[in-house]
């Protein structure tokens, strides 16, 4: 009977240690890889051509239409500004002072966005 209890205890300890090790590995890898977006003040730390997300507020009077579907604007985190170049349809919530996340690459000091995401506040207002 005592041998049976000891074997069961050893099995439980091994399972617990394996679960702890697995959870530790998962959490370590998630910590390294989860970055929702970087503010403009942090993008100088990223090398040119690397895919990243930059987020901030669209600066007032910075929206310039270059062509029919090309636009340039500046986002800020109130520390540093970043010029964004984007070609494509703008999100419906895009406007000055709005929070934006741009997905793309940094090239010669300008951020070339391939996708724009407009952030909105948490207050839901149904259409009237």
From Swiss-Prot:
One GO CC annotation: plasma membrane
| Transmembrane residue ranges | 9-29
Q: How does it sit in the membrane?
A: Single-pass type II membrane protein
Chief location: membrane
Question: Where is coiled-coil annotated?
Answer: none
Pfam families, per the entry: CcmE
| SUPFAM superfamilies assigned to the protein according to its UniProt record, in alphabetical order | Heme chaperone CcmE
Keywords attached to this Swiss-Prot or TrEMBL record, sorted alphabetically, are: Cell inner membrane, Cell membrane, Cytochrome c-type biogenesis, Heme, Iron, Membrane, Metal-binding, Signal-anchor, Transmembrane, Transmembrane helix
Positions of heme binding: 120, 124
User: What Gene3D superfamilies does its record include?
Assistant: Nucleic acid-binding proteins
For the biological process aspect of GO, one term held by this record is: cytochrome complex assembly
Where are the Cytoplasmic topological domains? 1-8
Entry keyword annotation includes Flavoprotein? no
What terms describe the molecular function in GO for this protein? heme binding; metal ion binding
The answer to whether the entry has keyword Iron is yes
Q: Which residues lie on this side of the membrane: Periplasmic?
A: 30-128
Which compartments does it reside in?
Cell inner membrane
Instruction: Report the NCBIfam families cross-referenced here.
Output: PRK13254.1-1
Q: What does this protein do?
A: Heme chaperone required for the biogenesis of c-type cytochromes. Transiently binds heme delivered by CcmC and transfers the heme to apo-cytochromes in a process facilitated by CcmF and CcmH.
Q: What family is it from?
A: Belongs to the CcmE/CycJ family.
Protein name in UniProt: Cytochrome c-type biogenesis protein CcmE
Source organism: Rickettsia conorii (strain ATCC VR-613 / Malish 7)
